C-alpha cells in the first residue's frame, strides 16, 4: 500500500515544490500589503512567503497542535475523535462477540443521529460500519455528553414497527407448534435471536402458539428499538480519526 507521502512526491516534483515533512510549522504571520519577502534561511529555521497558505489540520488531534494559527484570529474548532466503536460495559450482549448483522440501523436516543449498515458485536460493545458511521455523524454530540448516551438498535434495518409486526405475526401463524427459539427472521443469527427472546422473557421451550399479544409487543419493540447504554469509546484500529480544526 502506498503512503500519502509517497503519493504526493511525483506531484510535488512536477510542480517544483519542496516537501519539508516532518518539519513543524512555528507560525504563519499575515504580512501587510507590499512586495513579498524573499525566502530566507536562518539557523534551524526556514522562512517562506506566499500569496496563499492552505492549512490541512487532519494531523493535529489536539488543539495545541494548531497554536501556530492563533495570530491569524481564525475560529479554531477543537479536534475531537470522530470514528470509533462503542463500549457497553456490563451488557450480556457482549457474550455474542463475533456476531454480525448485515443490515442494522443504529441511532442515538433522543436525537436525529442515525446510520445503517453491518453491525458487529464485540467483547467490549459494538462496532462495524454502522457504528463507525454513527460515531462520525454524532461526534460532537457524543463528546459533549462525555460518551455516555443511550444507543437504539433496529436489528431489522429500516423496517417499521408495522412491517416487523406483520413478519412476526406471520411466523407465529405459520408455525404455531414450532419453538420460537428455532424459527426466526433469516437476517438474524441464531445466537442473537436466542439472546433477544430471552431478553423479553420468552422461554426456550415456548411455542409460537403460546406467545400472546403482550409477548408479541415486547418482541417487536425489542427488534426495532433495542436500547443499550454507551459508556465510553474505543479506538478503531490504531488511531482515532478526528474532526475539527
Place the predicted regions along the sequence by residue.
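Short acidic/polar capping segments at secondary-structure boundaries
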Residues: 52-62, 81-84, 111, 126-127
Amino acid at each position: 500500500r502506498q503512503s500519502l507521502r509517497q503519493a504526493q512526491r511525483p506531484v510535488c516534483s512536477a510542480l517544483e515544490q519542496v516537501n519539508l515533512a516532518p518539519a513543524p510549522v512555528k507560525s504563519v504571520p499575515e504580512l501587510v500589503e507590499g512586495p513579498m519577502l524573499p525566502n530566507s534561511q536562518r539557523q534551524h529555521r526556514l522562512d517562506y512567503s506566499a500569496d496563499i497558505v492552505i492549512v490541512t489540520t487532519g494531523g493535529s488531534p489536539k488543539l495545541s497542535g494548531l497554536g501556530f494559527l492563533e495570530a491569524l484570529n481564525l475560529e479554531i474548532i477543537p479536534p475531537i475523535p470522530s470514528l470509533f466503536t462503542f463500549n457497553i460495559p456490563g451488557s450480556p450482549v457482549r457474550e455474542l462477540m463475533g456476531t454480525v448483522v448485515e443490515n442494522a440501523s443504529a441511532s442515538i436516543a433522543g436525537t436525529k443521529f442515525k446510520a445503517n449498515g453491518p453491525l458487529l458485536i464485540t467483547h467490549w460493545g459494538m462496532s462495524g460500519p454502522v457504528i463507525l458511521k454513527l460515531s462520525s455523524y454524532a461526534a460532537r454530540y457524543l463528546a459533549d455528553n462525555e460518551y455516555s448516551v443511550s444507543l437504539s438498535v433496529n436489528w431489522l434495518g429500516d423496517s417499521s414497527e408495522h412491517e416487523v409486526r406483520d413478519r412476526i405475526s406471520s411466523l407465529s401463524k405459520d408455525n404455531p407448534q414450532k419453538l420460537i427459539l428455532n424459527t426466526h427472521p433469516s437476517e438474524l443469527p441464531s445466537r442473537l435471536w436466542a439472546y433477544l427472546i430471552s431478553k423479553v422473557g420468552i422461554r426456550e421451550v415456548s411455542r409460537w402458539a403460546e406467545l400472546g399479544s403482550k409477548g408479541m409487543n415486547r418482541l417487536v419493540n425489542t427488534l426495532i428499538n433495542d436500547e443499550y447504554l454507551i459508556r465510553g469509546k474505543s479506538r478503531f484500529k490504531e488511531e482515532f480519526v478526528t474532526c475539527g480544526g
